[in-house]
Amino acid sequence: MNSSSFYSLLQKKFPFQPTYKQDIFFQKIAIFLTEADNNTIFVLKGYAGTGKTTVISTIVNSLLDINKKYVLLAPTGRAAKVIANYSNKPAFTIHKKIYFPKKSSGGAVSFTLQQNKHTNTIFIVDEASMISDTNSDSKLYENGSLLDDLISYVYSGTNCKMILLGDTAQLPPVNLDISPALDIRTLGMNYNKEVEHIELDEVMRQEENSGILHNATELRELLKDSFIDEFKFDVKKFKDIVRLTDGYDIQDAINSAYSNYSIEDTAFIVRSNKRANQYNEQIRTKILGKESELSTGDFLMVVKNNYFWLKDSDEAGFIANGDIIEVLEIFNIKELYGFKFAKVKIRMIDYPNQIPFETVLLMDTIKSESPSLTYEESNRLYQEVLKDYEGETKFKQFQKVKVNEYFNGLQVKFSYAITCHKSQGGQWNTVFIEQPYLPDGINRDYIRWLYTAMTRAKNKLYLIGFKDESFVE
């Protein structure tokens, strides 16, 4: 099938009248998918509500017509679950797909890039704004970074190409100013690829009554300005975005979100770990009535990658920073090595096929204001565990610490309230956002933070602690 016939087919299969930009996208993608050249990357950028998911579902459901296969990928388990839900097709995390874990004799894990055995396959990668081109975890990243490895993996396959999807108004990866996987110059210059791209910027007619999208689009437009001095929410004419000022109203809203939907379909997004800790404590005691330091039914977020507890054949492969778990059983809580640990049975909520398993939680990170154990704390734990194996050779000691279950305890925090970076790639039915402390006033970083937080909400958004002047009269 040539590109013009494929373009006609895409138009036919698309469930709506395409917007001007969507139509151009279909023309461009039809050429990209039918031409033989394998040195091109396609970047589809799009604001919230502009139909990225709908056009991509149409593509996925049409690839068979041109004898192409597809693989759906995302940076996190939660983001993979989102793309799987909207496309009704299986999706994987990038890590699970492209890396092969190797355990050394010492018990340490290192990851090797897998061989891409796919042929005639289009790799569709969602939430690409989260993909970094810097080396942040030396256990991974053969070529220096996740983006390097992803491009290297995909384009080493026979007739394989990649479509990167994302929204440049979202927060970039930690410590970066831009999202390199959506940056046309970075992709062209650093990876020696041709880059075809388009940005969808018209909100679809079906979404025009959404207050969440109306306000998100206003924020998105602000980012085009060179100077940003204020933003006012427009909540009056919308039912899906609500301002809360009274403590009792906040409690009622959280209660009803938990009972009408579920705890795991509700997120409370704040600016710092300190605020998240405070809200988690309040929510657990006042709303969920949990008095002990850990209870069955508690939801926690893992805050550091952990390669110890799962086998490669498990659905998740490893337990990643940002994965949410539910505590099903608590066997014991004890102090050891100067730290506190809980032996528990958990399920991973973003991996429905992952069988629940027993593990050890490191409790000290729950109240900590740092994102995970500090270097000093990790070192202290290492030295204490090492004492258990005195009298062994240095190498034996090292080997035994590496497989000690307490040394490998999952670092966790409660996940009722989380920071915005941790929420990225996820969607929740109900989202609460607290106005952060802004010592420098409103700036571009804050607008991106707010935009990212707001667009995590599918149906209802509550705004807490925002001043009167933050709203349209």
Please annotate each region the language model reported:
Residues 22, 76, 272, 425:
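Short, conserved phosphate/pyrophosphate- and ester-handling motifs at nucleotide-, phospho-/glycolipid
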Residues 337-473:
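C-terminal accessory regions
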